[in-house]
From Swiss-Prot:
Domain of life: Eukaryota
Protein name: Homeodomain-interacting protein kinase 3
GO molecular function (one): protein serine kinase activity
Gene expressing this chain: Hipk3
Start-end of Polar residues biased regions: 1008-1022
Organism: Rattus norvegicus
């Protein structure tokens, strides 16, 4: 039974002294079970509801905040789940991963006794989770002085941690108890050969020893140290654990989802194991949710990750032997929901060294072969995993036996008696079964309760919450009542597959039990059965959640010495670099950083065919042409200075495009070098998806039907398997003429996904309001800057948070200013934006330079204001969030943002949760305070974007009030140097279109777009009207100002067109199906496969000296000197000049504008590409570009 801990004023304490320490006893009064009555069946996960929720605005499940309204010294009660410390084997309750500063250390030392049991030990409403009786009433009880009840990362609102009791150290503070436990003192220093660790908090205790939270001195790193007992009975197992951890340390812990062990050392004859700090175990998570059932879409990623860990252990011949919810840790439930790792290898052993009748596993999760004394292997871990996922589904253990007899009795009643061949061999079978002798044939039967009690003297108890006659009955438990239509059908199919897998995992015969590899291929994990419901929002949510557990593995593999190709290097001319493959649902864009003296090329998208709507091309890759220094490859001396690589796509797509002739490139392109010591490489940015059936000409965002998997989009090609042959010289039809020592500079595209993911390693700015659907990979090459602090400086400063900085809301912010600023620009207005719900403890103050000279004082409607319409795109789930793309200018940086999510003022709407959830009224965003969507929170300064152009107040309305457009794109040439050519586009969207406001000239026309709702119905209607675009206008599409939020970097410069250039109408090329015109790129949602669209610039007149020529991406946070560059051109043999094609992702949005005189281009404005300064239009599928069967 649980207890309440009551803290009394100091005069109530009775101090007792001994030879070892002075202790103030704490009065403990028992009370009823805290969780005796189940609350309404709802699960809070990061402000989201699962199951059958009721309207609530309370805190989320991951917040264990306990409001303390009374001052210190007054009586208060604590929930049991807050400070339970389990005294079980492997009960490593690691609760926080927040760096502790030296200034906040408590001044007083505290001694933890070896019998520190809070709240009557590990009990679940009267049910002990272990068979061992715990001595909970003997010994002095002590709680850490200044010990915060909450995890350090979740204490943002806790002003005063609770001082419970104090203790002063005695003369023998570091002695070892009779049971072998080490006597810890707070702020004691544990020393290894290389590092010193300061003890901060006590985390947990078990039969192995204890776990403490420590600070690694000299760094910001917080670790968990497991201090083993020095008792002789634990010495052998301690050595086994150390050897197993040493073996696992050679593997990628992030890829295989087990805890990372750093080092092992001896401290006062106690073995100390140093691990990474993790957040919370699954048992505590269930307890915080009052043991409410979890939905299958949450159980699935946990199962997948643990099965991946077991697969690796099986391949190494290792048995974990203690898998249970306490040993499955949530890495970071706030920023990486559903990301779990397996911990505690204290009971692990090699399969060749197993001994029958060994007491292994926690009882609730103990396999029948262990109970019966049969030989066992890795299959016992699969049984335990089956019990774990059943517990997550039921909210209660499937077989909660208080005794082993109860355990096998529960199993036999639900699944039938073990086979006779098993009972005959089992060394402990006669403890629970007896042979029948009065029958014609001998058989086994389970002993009755009376027989077992008479033999053992122990009375059996009924502890089950659900009593099943068959495992098939589980499908009817906790049915979801708020689903209908295809969502309900998908849920029923999911339940059937779940029960099918559970039955295979819980087979009594271990030889027939499913293996980890088979589990990963089961339809419940692969979700093949859900492909029958392509339009279900519930299914989409399942795929997005599964992406959480798939993304980190592929990315972290690259960042943990698995691919030296992507490891950062540092040189004199190039800063340390990193490569990031960012998962964006249907596209993985590679982000690279480099110094100012290098040009970064995101990629040259090469399209395989001309099919664009609803069909995937057979072979389609994006290559990155760049010197090895940019890729992080050190120069290999003594080897050839250049080579080519052929990249094969392993997963071809079905295509309807007619075969076209391959493009040619001059052989000298790949053989030239940028310098004498570097090499050129072609590196794929992403690989394609599994085969899908083409859906011809459907402009819909839900064209993910067929057999494709959302989670398979953007998978990275392993370098070791695909760089296996040499690529022939012919690559492009556009002949590229290069000066030998200079890098190629081509048009590139920014792909911006609205949800950046964050980890403890890189501290990306997190979009907390939608962290459930984080699908990004947690390792970033460079951090997407938030709103830039537009200071009038003529230098470049880069302020980055350290990778291992532990502040939760810290984000790297890059402050960039122009090398030379015009005086008129330097006088522009600045306004301060305070992000109200910033996850950072301090208020984020961001200053932005406006783009106007006139100081407007009258308020004008906020461009970011959300009207709360049902069609508001910013208020929808990320399943419908548009991806944003713009052609990079020299001052552009890759920015990640989420409309209505990472914005300072998220729209408070009942349906702002995932698509499959009903309106529940829960608007808690990870504990962040609510804020309104007001004008002062707008990421843009409240001043006009266009100089000398009257502003229309009606343009500030939210685009969501109208029909949502299918896509939004903007093509932007690089920065020009002539201020006379400036055109600042003011984005407005009152009728689903955006008209550019050209200085001194009205926008001639609009571009009609269909509503997104119509697109979702898959009506095969034409999205755009074909029209001629003249040179004196620039068309932009957008969903309104609500799409712009605080995560954008510098507002990029819009495409500007000199009005002096004569108009030259342009019609689209006829080379693709359904070429019903589009202005800049294709209709995003119709472009289902995410294949890059080829956007060559049309033939035009000669290039002027100040014309924009190529889209050059400059690395953020670096200086931008004027570089002298020899000229080059990208030309077609026939004389028609084209820009190198640019890859665009579906559902794209334009980037914010920036005044073009604020920043200077990287290169001088002389003509170095044969392109026109005026961009008239872009063909969807140029006839000059072809398919590449070798890609």
């Amino acid at each position: 039974m649980a207890s309440q801990v009551l803290v009394y004023p100091p005069y109530v304490y009775q101090t007792q002294s001994s030879a070892f320490c002075s202790v103030k006893k704490l009065k403990v009064e028992p009370s009823g079970c805290v969780f005796q009555e189940r609350a309404c069946p709802q699960i809070h996960v990061n402000g989201r509801h699962f199951g059958n929720p009721l309207p609530s605005t309370k805190g989320s499940a991951f917040q264990t905040k306990i409001p303390f309204s009374k001052p210190r010294g007054h009586s208060f009660s604590l929930q049991a789940g807050a400070i339970v410390v389990k005294d079980t084997a492997g009960a490593t309750k690691v609760i926080a991963a927040q760096a502790q500063q030296a200034g906040v250390e408590a001044p007083r030392a505290v001694v933890w006794r070896n019998r520190l049991h809070f709240l009557g030990g590990p009990q679940r409403c009267g049910l002990k989770r272990k068979s061992e009786e715990l001595d909970n009433h003997s010994g002095a009880m002590q709680i850490v002085d200044e010990l915060s009840i909450l995890p350090a990362m979740l204490q943002t609102n806790m002003g005063n941690p609770v001082t419970v009791v104090t203790a002063t150290t005695g003369s023998k503070q570091n002695c070892t108890s009779g049971e072998g436990d080490y006597q810890l003192v707070q702020h004691e220093v544990l020393c290894s050969v290389k590092n010193t660790y300061e003890v901060l908090d006590f985390l947990g205790r078990g039969t192995f020893g204890q776990v403490v939270k420590c600070w690694k001195r000299g760094t910001n790193e917080i670790v968990a140290i497991k201090i083993l007992k020095n008792h002789p009975s634990y010495a052998r197992q301690g050595q086994i654990e150390v050897s197993i951890l040493a073996r696992l340390s050679t593997e990628n812990a992030d890829e295989y989802n087990f805890v990372r062990a750093y080092e092992c050392f001896q401290h006062r004859n106690h073995t100390c194991l140093v691990f990474e700090m993790l957040e919370q175990n699954l048992y505590d998570f269930l307890k915080q949710n009052k043991f409410s059932p979890l939905p299958l879409k949450v159980i699935r990623p946990v199962l997948q990750q643990v099965a991946t860990a077991l697969k690796k252990l099986k391949s190494l011949g290792l048995i974990h032997a203690d898998l249970k919810p306490e040993n499955i840790m949530l890495v970071d439930p706030v920023r990486q929901p559903y990301r779990v790792k397996v911990i505690d290898f204290g009971s692990a052993s090699h399969v060749s060294k197993t001994v029958c009748s060994t007491y292994l596993q926690s009882r609730y999760y103990r396999a029948p072969e262990i109970i019966l004394g049969l030989p066992f292997c890795e299959a016992i871990d699969m049984w335990s995993l089956g019990c774990v996922i059943a517990e997550l589904f039921l909210g209660w253990p499937l077989y909660p036996g208080a005794l082993e007899y109860d355990q096998i009795r529960y199993i036999s009643q639900t699944q039938g008696l073990p086979g006779e061949q098993l009972l005959n061999v089992g060394t402990k079978s006669t403890r629970f079964f007896c042979r029948e002798t009065d029958m014609s044939h001998s058989g086994w039967r389970l002993k009755t309760l009376e027989e077992h009690e008479a033999e053992t003297g122990m009375k059996s108890k009924e502890a089950r919450k659900y009593i099943f006659n068959s495992l098939d009955d589980i499908v009817h438990v906790n049915t979801v009542m708020d689903l209908e239509g295809s969502d309900l059908l998908a849920e029923k199919a999911d339940r059937r597959e779940f029960v099918s897998l559970l039955k295979k995992m819980l087979l009594i015969d271990a030889d027939l039990r499913i293996t980890p590899i088979e589990t990963l291929n089961h339809p419940f994990v692969s979700m093949k059965h859900l492909l029958d419901f392509p339009h279900s929002s519930h299914v989409k949510s399942c795929f997005h959640i599964m992406d959480i557990c798939k993304s980190p593995s592929s990315c972290e593999t690259n960042n943990h010495s698995k691919m030296s190709l992507l490891r950062p290097v540092a040189s004199n001319g190039t800063a340390a670099l990193a490569a990031n493959f960012t998962k964006v649902g249907t596209l993985r864009s590679q982000a690279l950083t480099t110094s100012a003296h290098s040009v970064v090329h995101h990629g040259i998208p090469l399209q395989a065919g001309t099919a664009q709507f609803g069909c995937g091309d057979a072979f389609h890759q994006t290559l990155i042409i760049c010197p090895p220094a940019i890729q992080g490859i050190p120069a290999a001396h003594g080897k050839p200075t250049s080579y080519s690589i052929r990249v094969d796509n392993t997963v071809p797509l079905v295509t309807q495009a007619p075969a076209v002739q391959p493009l040619q490139i001059r052989p000298g392109v790949l053989s030239q070098t940028w310098s004498g010591r570097t090499q050129q490489m072609l590196i794929p940015a992403w690989q394609q998806v599994t085969p899908m059936a083409p859906a011809a000409a459907t402009l819909t965002s839900e064209g993910m039907a067929g057999s494709q998997r959302l989670g398979d989009w953007g998978k990275m090609i392993p370098h070791s398997n695909h760089y296996n042959s040499v690529m022939p010289p012919p690559l492009l039809t556009n002949q590229i003429t290069l000066s030998a020592p200079q890098p190629i500079s081509v048009g590139i595209a920014h792909v911006v996904w609205p949800q950046p993911a964050t980890t403890k390693k890189n501290k990306l700015c997190q979009n907390r309001s939608n962290s459930l659907q984080n699908t990004n990979v947690p390792h970033s090459a460079f951090i997407s800057p938030k709103i830039i602090s537009g200071k009038e400086v003529e230098e470049v400063s880069c302020v980055e948070t350290q990778d291992n900085h532990t502040s939760e809301g810290e984000a790297r912010t890059c402050h960039e200013a122009s090398v030379r600023q015009d005086s008129s620009v330097s006088d522009k207005q600045r306004q301060t934006i305070i992000i109200a719900d910033s996850p950072s403890p301090a208020v984020s103050v961001i200053t932005i330079s406006s783009d106007t000279d006139d100081e407007e004082t009258s308020p004008r409607p906020s461009l970011r204001e959300c009207k709360g319409s049902l069609d508001c795109e910013a208020c929808q789930s990320t399943l419908n969030i548009d991806r944003m793309c713009s052609l990079s200018s020299p001052d552009s940086t890759l920015s990640t943002s989420s409309s209505g999510q990472s914005s300072p003022s998220p729209c408070k709407r009942p349906n702002s949760m995932s698509d499959d959830e009903q309106e529940s009224g829960c608007e808690t965003v990870d504990g962040s305070p609510t804020s309104d969507s007001s004008g002062h929170d707008s990421p843009f300064a409240e001043s006009s974007f266009v100089e000398d152009t009257p502003q229309n107040p009606e343009l500030g309305t939210c685009a969501g009030t109208e029909a949502k457009p299918a896509l939004s794109t903007a093509v932007e040439p690089p920065v020009g140097t002539e201020r006379g050519l400036n055109v600042d586009a003011h984005m407005a969207n009152t009728d689903s279109t955006c008209q550019p406001l050209t200085k001194g000239q009205p926008a001639p026309g609009k571009l009609n777009q269909p509503s997104a709702s119509a697109a979702r119905q898959q009506k095969p209607t034409s999205a755009f009207q074909q029209q001629h675009l003249n040179l004196s206008q620039v068309q932009h599409f957008g969903t309104g100002h609500q799409e712009w939020n605080g995560n954008f970097g510098h507002r990029r410069q819009q495409a500007y067109i000199p009005t002096s250039v004569t108009s030259n109408p342009f019609t689209l090329s006829h080379g693709s199906p359904n070429h019903t015109a589009v202005h800049a790129h294709l209709a995003g949602s119709a472009h289902l496969g995410g294949q890059p669209t080829l956007l060559p610039y049309p033939p035009s007149t000669a290039l002027s000296s100040a014309a924009p020529v190529a889209h050059l991406l400059a690395s953020p946070c670096t200086s931008r000197p004027m570089l002298q560059h020899p000229t080059y051109n990208i030309s077609h043999p026939s004389g028609i000049v084209h820009q190198v094609p640019v890859g665009i992702n579906p559902r794209l949005l334009p980037s914010p504008t920036i005044h073009q005189t604020q920043y200077k281009p990287i290169f001088p404005p002389h003509s170095y590409i044969a392109a026109s300064p005026a961009y008239t239009g872009f063909p969807l599928s140029p006839t000059k570009l072809s398919q590449y069967p070798y890609m």
